[in-house]
């Protein structure tokens, strides 16, 4: 009887350790998926801006941090006072959420949810309508697991990225991020 109890308790301990590792793997997979799918949505917004010949802006839905909405810009073309009416939207699965200037994302990144001329999706002849640089940051719940969609001036495409952990010493660069 004691032997059975020992075996059952060992199995319980081992399975609990496996579940904890599995939950971390699930979180990593979900944030990677959110980054890749958000990158595809950003490309779609850029194409939509060119097709409609309009300036579009990204905003986090006030009712849901899992949803990004696309709205038309006003006459200033700097996303400072977007018009009402959602042109498109995209949602990711909870507990992943879109965040503005998170502690886990590089401080050098221009946040596309902001209000200035550098964050507007503008039709540009021969180039993608995405802003020249910057991106979007995604966090998995309250954990230090992050996804990002970024663009820099040297590439004419958006890049989905991922990292686990928050080393505050490297928040000024993309050195500890992995491209997907």
Predicted regions and their residues:
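N-terminal helix-rich module
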Residues: 17-29, 36, 47, 55, ...
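Phosphate-interacting basic helix/loop segments used at nucleotide- and nucleic-acid interfaces
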Residues: 40-44
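N-terminal single-pass transmembrane signal-anchor helix
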Residues: 1-23
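Conserved catalytic core of two-component sensor histidine kinases
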Residues: 8, 32, 39
